Amino acid sequence: MSEEQKLPKEPPILLPGAADFTEEQIEAARVFFAQPVSFIMGAVRMDAMPPSDLPEVAFAGRSNVGKSSLINGLVNQKYLARASNEPGRTREINFFLLAEKVRLVDLPGYGFARVSRSIADKFQDLGRAYLRGRANLKRVYVLIDARHGLKKVDLEALDALDVAAVSYQIVLTKADKIKPAEVDKVVAETQKAIAKRAAAFPRVLATSSEKGLGMPELRAEIVRLCIDE
């Protein structure tokens, strides 16, 4: 195991929305996410994707919301998932294999304005096809910038997930960039906004990949979904 993959053993820092996990569950998740992880492939067509033989969790969100940083933070690597220098330029669904047991899936960002409408529609259609066609998809984590909360384009994405009947959970990113009271407020507002959405998991988790906030709980949530169930 490389030094980069070794996750430091440290007590979890809880933020609003954190689940009630035991210390043993948090530690087991830390160990699981310290196992080897690698980029498998980027797919631009459904027939080019890996087989549906392993559980998957996917990450969605507006361009520049911090998807790459979150994925890298989960596995404690800096450059596994690479962010595009220009918003909206990631046009593939990227698959990463963790511990030979779970796939982490990075979906193309939405809500960008620097690509043509036809190109935007093409890879948003790819994302929708993935959501409808993956029986092994355990959950979609929809990332929302804690500084801005839910935007219209986010609500449209949630509508699509509801229609597809795909289980999803809101994860607030960059929670370290605002005051704790503001984090509490945006968590409460977001939970209220999704309360009547059938496919939404009711708990909103606040995180910061830069500070490690909420990451132990998110790891434990993924392990519970993909390994324990």
UniProtKB/Swiss-Prot annotation:
Its cofactor is Mg(2+). PROSITE patterns: G_ENGB. Residues 53-228 form the EngB-type G domain. Pfam families: MMR_HSR1. The keyword Cell division applies. SUPFAM superfamilies: P-loop containing nucleoside triphosphate hydrolases (SSF52540). GTP binds at residues 61-68, 88-92, 106-109, 173-176, 207-209. One of its GO terms (cellular component) is cytosol. The keyword Cell division applies. It comes from the Bacteria. Gene3D superfamilies: P-loop containing nucleotide triphosphate hydrolases. One of its GO terms (molecular function) is GTP binding. HAMAP family: GTPase_EngB (MF_00321). Necessary for normal cell division and for the maintenance of normal septation. PANTHER family: ENGB-TYPE G DOMAIN-CONTAINING PROTEIN (PTHR11649:SF13), MSS1/TRME-RELATED GTP-BINDING PROTEIN (PTHR11649). This is Probable GTP-binding protein EngB. It comes from Caulobacter vibrioides (strain NA1000 / CB15N). The lineage of its organism: Bacteria, Pseudomonadati, Pseudomonadota, Alphaproteobacteria, Caulobacterales.
